[in-house]
């Protein structure tokens, strides 16, 4: 769809890639057949992934965010994603160029192709048509606005409080890993009841700590207008922002401009 996928097409063309328009009813079947007959040839929609990963490169760009920082930001973005039984969103972080979009929403090529074929009654896998649409919310870990959001989240949580909960999680994780290492060579019936109780206790404690941190991060995310704006811009680029959500986006945009 040249209109709905315009931003993805434009970015691909700016990189010097040729983009084929394949919107016929049989095109899904044709490209699958063509790929099977030509080893090493692969087709992908322009919105199947971020432009840096549509065609894999040997050189990898460095990620500005640490794994811990990504874990902090994931619930923040999750909090403002659409809640719909027909759509599933998964937040991932990629080391894109800082001048690229801060948030991009993509849809897995395989799942998209299977659902399209299922809709036509082909592919031999009709159950794909009953599955929710699955999207990746790709957050650009090198974008200045993402760094700004991280700073706001850390300040909003409180440096000492965040450090404290992270330390508790790290300690509980270490304790659980140590116990699992101790028990790894034992069969379940060989594990003493006290050890089983300890394992359950550690697992429950770690789960509660993570839920506590996630709940606080989601609260901060829901109140962050910049997060909502970036997600809505990505949804808008993918043609998925409509109705009430579109109206809220317009109102928020006006408020942010007035400031």
Say what each PLM segment does.
Residues 1-259:
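Long, intrinsically disordered, charge-dense linkers/tails
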